[in-house]
């Protein structure tokens, strides 16, 4: 899929912008504060239903305005049932209002399912060395887009988990807790299996990508922590064993909501030994592997939004990343404060835009 038109009204530093990106590589150059990141933020907002830079009160609406609007048209590129799509997202007062193909949507998940965006921004490197919740979200995003029933499965697990935690806080009777343990284990085992299988698919894509981009790291796979000792006992038994502790804590201490995964290297002891630049490359390759899996399952590429791609990467690694991006038929939106040397060989296969004072001008 690729965006054919993006309209912003009263979004961040933009008053009104009507922009037409190209299907392939799109480079956006401008000074800090010019609106480059805000442009990708708007695309991200349409694909995730939230910003990666804060909430509405953090300056999402242009100063002096009372509302914001984002409209996006895109072309699906799957071989079967490809069509043109249109979506809009507005914020008035305290409410977000979304529309998809001319119809008002009740939940932003409908919009997120339609427009797939993979975003790399300043905090994305935390994927591999920060808290486990980010890594669970990473897996769940991919499953949400390639397995139609995954959202329902995830919601069922979340609902049952909340019910069990409520019973633990209220010190409810054992019989009632046992019933919810059974439900939690049934859904939890399914959720864990989906995540594990998806991570195994990603491993087959990540290893060759990292070997090509930074071969010295020698990645050999991922370690998946199920959230309990699954190799020793099923979830239903683990919940029974932890029941007394859970009563004491007032919440469920194990299960898929405690799962995690980490890349494994033969060249270094762990991710904490990576430089910031290496961490950025590993994260970026994980995201590209996710994009490849999306293509393999759906028959089209998601939109890639890469903010400040060249920072902390030397010219050699810039070139390798851009060479890889130029080989895939995905729409890629890349920002930077200047034109890095590593990008110049790829201008012939993309377009360059200058962002200044809330305006976007094509350079070539």
Curated annotation (Swiss-Prot):
UniProt-recorded Gene Ontology molecular function terms: ATP binding; single-stranded DNA binding
Keyword ATP-binding: yes
Keywords carried by this UniProt record: ATP-binding, Cytoplasm, DNA damage, DNA repair, DNA replication, DNA-binding, Nucleotide-binding, SOS response
Gene3D superfamilies: P-loop containing nucleotide triphosphate hydrolases, RecF/RecN/SMC, N-terminal domain
Binding site for ATP: 30-37
An example Gene Ontology CC term for this record: cytoplasm
Highest rank taxon of the organism: Bacteria
Keyword DNA repair: yes
UniProt subcellular location: Cytoplasm
GO annotation, biological process: DNA replication; DNA synthesis involved in DNA repair; double-strand break repair; SOS response
Function: The RecF protein is involved in DNA metabolism; it is required for DNA replication and normal SOS inducibility. RecF binds preferentially to single-stranded, linear DNA. It also seems to bind ATP.
Family: Belongs to the RecF family.
Protein name as it appears in the record: DNA replication and repair protein RecF
Source organism of this protein record: Xylella fastidiosa (strain Temecula1 / ATCC 700964)
Upper taxonomic lineage: Bacteria, Pseudomonadati, Pseudomonadota, Gammaproteobacteria, Lysobacterales
């Amino acid at each position: 899929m690729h965006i054919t038109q993006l309209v912003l009204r009263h979004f961040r530093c933009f008053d009104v912008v009507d922009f037409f990106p190209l299907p392939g590589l799109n480079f956006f150059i401008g000074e800090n504060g010019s609106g480059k990141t805000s442009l990708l933020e708007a695309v991200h907002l349409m694909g995730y239903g939230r910003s990666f830079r804060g909430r509405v009160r953090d300056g999402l609406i242009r100063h002096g305005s009372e509302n914001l609007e984002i409209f996006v048209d895109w072309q699906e590129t799957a071989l079967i049932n490809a069509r043109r799509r249109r979506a809009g997202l507005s914020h008035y007062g305290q409410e977000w209002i979304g529309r998809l193909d001319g119809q008002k949507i009740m939940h932003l998940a409908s919009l997120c399912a339609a427009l797939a965006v993979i975003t790399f921004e300043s905090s994305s490197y935390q994927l591999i060395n920060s808290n486990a919740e980010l890594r669970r979200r990473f897996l769940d995003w991919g499953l949400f887009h390639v397995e139609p029933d995954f959202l329902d499965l995830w919601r069922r697990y979340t609902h049952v988990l909340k019910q069990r935690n409520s019973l633990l806080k209220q010190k409810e009777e054992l019989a009632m807790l046992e019933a919810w343990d059974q439900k939690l284990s049934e859904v939890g085992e399914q959720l864990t299996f989906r995540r594990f299988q998806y991570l195994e698919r990603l491993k087959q894509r990540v290893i060759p990508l990292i070997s090509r981009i930074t071969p010295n790291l020698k990645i050999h796979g991922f370690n998946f922590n199920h959230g309990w000792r699954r190799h020793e006992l099923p979830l239903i038994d683990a919940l029974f064993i932890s029941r007394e502790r859970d009563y004491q804590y007032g919440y469920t201490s194990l299960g898929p909501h405690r799962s995690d995964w980490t890349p494994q290297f033969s060249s270094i002891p762990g991710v904490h030994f990576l430089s910031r630049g290496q961490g950025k490359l590993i994260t970026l390759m994980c995201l590209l592997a996710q994009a490849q899996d999306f293509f393999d399952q759906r028959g089209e590429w998601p939109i890639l939004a890469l903010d400040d791609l060249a920072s902390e990467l030397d010219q050699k690694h810039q070139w390798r990343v851009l060479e890889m991006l130029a080989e895939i038929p995905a729409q890629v939106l890349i920002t930077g404060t200047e034109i890095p040397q590593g990008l110049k060989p790829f201008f012939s296969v993309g377009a360059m835009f200058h962002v200044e004072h809330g305006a976007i001008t094509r350079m070539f």
